């Protein structure tokens, strides 16, 4: 199973995004390799962008939507707490990475920041 990050979904959905081609190719590759999931956190982040729920559901058809568990929330909070405040990043990124880490899944993302905070997480990037 591969958990796809919001950054990849955003680039894939937006044909004018500078990473659109890379994200699209990466998604095609992982869809051929494994089952693909997105977090409910990604749904929340995408809802801010003004898409309708119906359009979003159609775009993500075939992807498994996973909920945040208590274990995911705990792990996200523990890692976030270790991050120096001057480098704080949005907590949603930590929820999504915690979900992948807790399940032992690979994580497809365009966001290469703060990878070292997740030593047991296998990151996948489009080339």
Please identify what each model-predicted range represents:
Residues 24, 43, 53-56, 73-76, ...:
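A general structural signal for well-ordered alpha-helical segments in protein cores
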Residues 1-37, 47-58:
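Short, well-structured N-terminal submotif of metal-dependent ribonuclease cores
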Residues 5-7, 38-39, 89-90, 111-112, ...:
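Histidine- and aromatic-rich ligand-binding microenvironments
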